[in-house]
Amino acid sequence: LKFGANQLHETNTYRLVIDNEKDLSGLPQGVIATAAETAKENGLEGKWVFTLQNPSIMPFLQYADNRNLREQIYKAYIDRGSQDNAYNNWANISKMVSLRVQKARLLGFPDYASYVLDDNMAKNSENVYQLCNRIWEAALPISRQEARELQKMIDKTGGRFKLAPVSYTHLRAHETP
């Protein structure tokens, strides 16, 4: 319960405040209007506010031309619950893992994965690993090709950076069919 509450708090309280209209480049007008309304609701009239809520962050990652700002909001999203503050989830994660191990052992299983998989089609972790490896072998060449194509897009448009997760959504939105 505490884990989810911490994640929710960090999602609900983060604000990326933009005060330079140039930083809105690439964003659709509707997204900009919503960010202006969010800013107004937060007492920041004349600015634009983006949050970690999906209707705000997703179009920002997809359309914003400013890579540094995309990186900033992306990092805030993936780092929720891991900041050095009262909402850090590391202790909660450790406790959850410990309790899962205890539960599994009390029920006669060597570990939590064995407990969960016992009632599933996979039956055991070895079968899961085999399936994952088969998928991995098929997906890896395709993923590498896709990464090469996206890096070519970056290079072609004068980008001086290597492909990173923060750029994926943006590049996909701007690629030509």
Locate the predicted segments by residue.
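Zn2+-dependent metallopeptidase catalytic core
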Residues: 128, 132-143
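Single conserved hydrophobic/aromatic residue that forms the stacking wall/gate
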Residues: 170-177
